[in-house]
UniProtKB/Swiss-Prot annotation:
Family membership: Belongs to the heat shock protein 70 family.
Protein name, as recorded: Chaperone protein DnaK
Phosphothreonine sites (modified residues): T197
GO molecular function: ATP binding; ATP-dependent protein folding chaperone; unfolded protein binding
Protein's UniProt keywords contain Chaperone: yes
Domain of life: Bacteria
Gene3D superfamilies cross-referenced by the UniProt entry: 1.20.1270.10, 3.30.420.40, Actin, Chain A, domain 4, Substrate Binding Domain Of DNAk, Chain A, domain 1
Keyword set includes Lipid metabolism: no
Function field: Acts as a chaperone.
Segments of this protein annotated with the region Disordered: 598-625
Induction: By stress conditions e.g. heat shock.
Keywords in alphabetical order: ATP-binding, Chaperone, Nucleotide-binding, Phosphoprotein, Stress response
Length: 625
């Protein structure tokens, strides 16, 4: 049976592993290394280099050497993070159909295509190691990758000729590799700080089950950012000394990047190191050399705020899981950047627990992916992974209310269905605005996408039944569909993720939801009251048309007057809750005679049965544009 390889497709380095002989083993690449630089280069001769060969020539070919492509995977070109990446990366980032792509020698490549070249290299090396074709893989992604980023990763695998059996979250994968599923029931925290992304996840493990309780992170925080702090510091020092800005010279900047990365690594074991770059640039007076000593203390001061950001996210995720620091039994450190002493020190101080560093942080995620591959192939028995939705999902309904369909923290895969209806008579279509967030009003949440369901037969408002289904698969990819139950017509959208959320946005949204909870509840109550008032006016007018000859003309005038008064109040957008309630009460009271006439007709058997009415009561008015 063909082997499934587990792949950690990293920002700076990638790794692969395979499950064989009842254990997961790291596969070395053709160069004999356990990790492969996630770098692709295009030479003037038309060659494409991947991994170590690409890294070696980066200094002399910065414009055609692509690294950290994961940072723009699934990113829209107009996002702030794309602009930030443009400033930092020496190659050209361009707009391709609204999404980020790279331009090399007048040719445009998507992040999926670049990533696919890395995956192809890993695939070929795995085939060489195993002595057989490799066609299936499990690929890991940061827990906080949005739908677009997950899809882009899967597409990269497809381009590389791999059937991606599962996209698995990196912290969950790490928990498998540490064998945490075999222990007694415990609450585990995985702190994953890699080259370009940060994840923190709280899991409950034991009895062969790994269940995610809460997750958070930042898709744009990692070792690259630590390197950038050294680059900025060294460039500023050089500018102060020589009056030359190295950031305007891409070749000098690439040399400085390599030196900064090496300095960072050396400072994990040494108290001081030297950045020594002879002939870094030149001016009219001759060549210039950059020679700067940097101490560990200086490096720690440069990155202190970034480390504190990770601590804040730990605090947020533990709270989101409904736990306190004392509930955490074990802290697992994952990712190359966790080798930095200051990172270890701060995490240990915050959690007050010794850190689990028993597995190589660069390899652990790939090992876990290989174990998951074994699970999917049936080679590993009785292991169950349970991931969760990070935020609630729903749609916009009448009056701009956000109606939740899938609550935050629901275990995936999941499928939820809810029935909605039309807001106006003879409405031919409904517009579905898919939302993500915890706020009561649609405008305060994130819109993930919109689609229309048309061809609804003419019918009074509230009669059509529109079945809206949210389907989240095991990869965390969302599909939303809407179906008119009468005609069977349906429409669906696979959420593009163009409005995907960073963890900072998540935290902000959750905090805002808490902060504005009372205010939101009041606003929602007013909107619902207005919806009820509008519905009452509609039903009263309809009943009046049908039964006005059954009641006295004086009663008809009273009802018409009360309807007009309520309509006038509804025209006032600032009408208070009390005003609305008073007018609703008045119309309800004067309409008693009308209700009696309607009831008398129903008793006569000319009205539809109560079962239909009861069914309609459960239908929610859908917002239509």
């Amino acid at each position: 049976m063909a082997k499934v390889i587990g792949i950690d497709l990293g920002t700076t380095n990638s790794a692969m592993a395979v499950y064989e002989g009842n254990e997961a083993k790291i596969i070395a690449n053709k160069e004999g290394k356990n990790t492969t630089p996630s770098i692709v280069a295009f030479t003037d001769k038309g060659e494409i280099l991947v991994g170590e060969p690409a890294k070696r020539q980066a200094v002399t070919n910065p414009k055609k050497t692509v690294y950290s492509i994961k940072r723009i995977m699934g990113l829209m070109f107009n996002e702030d993070k794309a602009k930030e990446a443009e400033k930092r990366l020496p190659y050209n980032i361009v707009d391709r159909n609204g999404a980020c792509a790279v331009e090399i020698a007048d040719k445009i490549y998507t992040p999926q295509e670049i990533s696919a070249k890395i995956l192809m290299k890993l695939k070929e090396d795995a085939q060489s190691y195993l002595g057989e074709d490799v066609t299936e893989a499990v690929i890991t992604v940061p827990a906080y990758f949005n739908d677009s980023q997950r899809k882009a990763t899967k597409e990269a695998g497809t381009i590389a000729g791999l059937n991606v059996l599962r996209i698995i979250n990196e912290p969950t994968s790490a928990a498998l590799a540490y064998g945490l599923d075999k222990k007694e029931a415990e609450k585990i925290m995985v702190y994953d700080l890699g080259g370009g992304t940060f994840d923190v996840t709280v899991l409950e493990t034991g009895d062969n089950v790994v269940e995610v309780l809460a997750t958070g992170g930042d898709a744009f925080l990692g070792g690259d950012d630590f390197d950038n702090r050294i680059i900025d510091w060294a460039a500023e020092e050089f500018k102060s000394d020589e009056g030359i800005d190295l950031k305007n010279d891409v070749m000098a900047l690439q040399r400085l990047k390599d030196a900064a990365e090496n300095a960072k690594k050396e400072l994990s074991s040494a108290q001081e190191t030297e950045i020594n770059l002879p002939f870094i640039t030149a001016d009219a007076s001759g060549p210039k050399h950059l020679v700067k000593k940097i101490t560990r203390a200086k490096f720690e001061s440069l990155i202190d705020d970034l480390i504190e950001d990770t601590i804040k996210k730990i605090e947020f995720v533990i709270k989101d899981a409904g736990l306190s620091q004392s509930d955490i039994s074990e802290v697992v450190m994952v990712g190359g950047s966790t080798r930095i002493p200051k990172v270890q020190e701060r995490v240990k101080a915050f959690i007050s627990k010794d850190l689990n560093k028993s597995v190589n942080p660069d390899e652990v995620v790939a090992v876990g992916a290989a174990i998951q591959g074994g699970v999917l192939k049936g080679d590993v028995k009785d292991v169950l992974l349970l991931d969760v939705t990070p935020l609630s999902l729903g749609i916009e309904t009448a009056g701009g209310i956000s109606t939740k369909v899938v609550e935050r923290g629901v275990t995936i895969p999941t499928k939820k269905t809810q029935i909605f209806s039309t807001y106006e008579d003879n409405q031919p279509a409904v517009s579905i605005n898919v939302l993500q967030g915890e706020r009561e009003l649609a405008r305060d949440n994130k819109s993930l996408g919109r689609f229309d369901l048309s061809g609804i037969p003419a019918a009074p408002r509230g009669v059509p039944q529109i079945e809206v289904t949210f389907d989240i698969d095991a990869n965390g990819i969302l599909t939303v569909s809407a179906k008119d139950k009468a005609t069977g017509k349906s429409q669906e959208i696979k959420i593009s993720g163009s409005s995907g959320l960073s963890d900072a946005e998540i935290e902000k949204m959750v905090k805002e939801a808490e902060l504005h909870k009372e205010e939101d509840t009041k606003k929602k109550a007013i909107i619902e009251l207005r919806n009820n008032a509008d519905s009452l006016v509609y039903q009263t007018k309809k009943s009046l048309e049908e039964f006005k000859d059954k009641i006295e003309s004086a009663e008809v005038e009273k009802i018409q007057s009360a309807v007009a008064a309520l309509e006038e109040t509804l025209k006032n957008e600032n009408a208070s809750k009390e005003e609305l309630e008073e007018k609703i009460k008045n119309l309800t009271e004067v309409s008693h005679k009308l209700a009696e006439a309607a009831y008398a007709k129903e008793q006569g058997g000319t009205q539809q049965g109560t079962d239909t009415k009861k069914k309609d009561d459960d239908v929610i008015d859908a917002e239509v544009e």
